[in-house]
Amino acid sequence: MKLRVLFSYLLIGALIWSCKENAPEKSATSSVETSFDYVVEQFADIQILRYQIPGFNELSIDQKKLVYYLYQAGLAGRDIMWDQNYRHNLQIRAALENVYENFSGDKENENWKAFETYLKRVWFSNGIHHHYSNDKLVPGFSPEYLTELLNETNTELSGEPFDVIFNEQDSKKVNKKKGVDNVAASAVNFYDPSITDKEVEAFYATAYKGPEGKPVETGLNTKLVKRNGKISEEIYKSGGLYGSAIDEIIKWLELAKGVAENEQQGNTLALLIEYYKTGNLDTWDEYAISWVNSKEGDIDWINGFIEVYNDPKGYKGSYESIIQIKDFEMSKQMAVLSENAQWFEDTSPLMEEHKKKNVVGVSYKTVNVAAEAGDASPSTPIGVNLPNNNWIRQEHGSKSVSLGNIIDSYNNAGGSGRLKEFANDTEEIAFEEKYGKTASKLLTALHEVVGHASGQLNEGVGQPKETLKNYASTMEEGRADLVGLYFLMDPKLQELGLTDNYEELGKTAYDRYIRNGLVTQLVRINLGDDIEEDHMVNRQWVSSWVFEKGMSDKVIEKVERDGNTYYNINDYKKLRELFGELLQETQRIKSEGDFKAAQDLVEGYGVKVDQKLHAEVLERNSVFKSAPYSGFVNPELVAEMNDAGEIVNVSIVQPETFAGQMISYSKNYGFLK
């Protein structure tokens, strides 16, 4: 499970929550410079940033090799994510990139500029659907203009892959709306287009689920296909679906295993390799157990088919890779959270029968990202808690990480204009300026370390993807948010040395959460649209529920001033109680598998938008030029060789342009044809 930055760096105050051929021209900027240019460029609704890798130059040569091999393994699977997102993505990308590189005509007119913008949006989203809203991207040029470009560059793109750029077909990558066939209405490539919601449920009702009490993540690494009327799975593995890319992943993982920091780490990599070779989900669980217990060493990684947000049914994992270097100082400061995990569980407002009696193995680290790929790039999370399998988490624990250098990049690229526009008063602004960054880090930490690790299912109740279905993801993210919100106003945080004033810290966190959940996140959707993305939905249902339940006591007051709308919290302690009540209810829903209650909560509070308020927010936001979404180019790791072909050093080079990195990736890591 991951906590994403779902807004631009300017909105971060609202929540926190090789030697290569054909490489692009690069700057001489390195990760050790004191002056660093965080912003690459901006287009459409996207801002592209850079991040540094603190601590990389202090690693030993074997540690640098380990990072480099894992970096290569991650990028080797990049195109898997593109194909998972939509069946025509790779063909469309290849055609658009060929035009981009070879067109020699007029590049100053509006049509070409619109083409460039569209291609950059496709790159950013790993396909033709928006990375966040899941809506199909709308090109700012005509079919006739694209045909002209294709002809002038001798590029082939015809039939459905051409038509789908412009027509209404496959308009949603993921559609979790109530009342529609969520599978048939979703363009994501986890299921053949002819497969329906009921067919998926029927197939997985009888599929292998693992040993009793230790269920595997059924369907995680497969595509469901229909051949001659019969439904079956194609497995992602060597020799199977995506085999050519997976073989490259395996090649680099084998090299990484050879320079592992310790025996446990090496054994863990061996299990990951075995999983990629076989596609066996029991092996995946063995790997996850070994990985969660691999806590020594400075280097760690996430690699595999992991998060299920892109599957309307919650079975299929999207490919991702994140390479991490431990931030020792920050990890030491935040270790007290994992050390006190049982205290948080025992004192939480959950029903006693839903509390874990023995919270095991919760580890928390702040890390610096060295590289990302797949579902984690260019749009990246800021916090991750894994593994996702509930029984493994309960018996073996979990790892929670905060991506420190990613958060720092957002903070260093930011400004305060939107805060001053949407905050209710100067006190709110002052709290944000004083405690905003700390509140961000602590909400991320509490969400990941305590939130996702808390609570337990009732005996005999199925996994949330089976019981809560299309509401499982937003319910889990909201539940983890509520854990964080409840404890952010607790004196325990001050006792643990995490803040100098828990009350002001809590007020800051509550202000920013309500401000974002009820107001500022609306800048990310079009007027008239419902909220659909799981994290946005969860922030609205949490905020709307506590607003409504506290209305009679004016816990939160809606303020209209000079034609603008604000929300002012009058009673922070009562608000904390409401967060606690809602937390107890969301845990009950999860523990009991209460689909109807989840549906009522999400549909009743999280989806529909006040259209008058939405129009107002969009108008107020229009004066700001910064984009509502941000993502990153990755630093490029360059292996320096001696005459014998051995790696003697690995250096960091920052890419000059977003387009340059995307073209380079396609040329060097295009293993799916």
Q: What does each model-found stretch correspond to?
A:
Residues 15-18:
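C-terminal motif of bacterial Sec signal peptides marking the signal peptidase cleavage site
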Residues 116-117, 123-225, 229-430, 436:
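Contiguous, non-catalytic segments that form substrate-binding/exosite surfaces or channel walls
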Residues 60, 262, 473-490:
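An active-site-proximal "capping" alpha-helix that borders the catalytic cofactor pocket
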Residues 20-22:
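Bacterial signal peptide processing site
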Residues 455-478:
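Post-HEXXH active-site segment of zinc metalloproteases
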Residues 571-673:
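Extended, compositionally biased alpha-helical segments that mediate assembly or anchoring
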Residues 449-461, 487, 491:
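Catalytic Zn2+-binding segment of zinc metalloproteases
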Residues 81, 485-589:
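Long, well-structured alpha-helical subdomains associated
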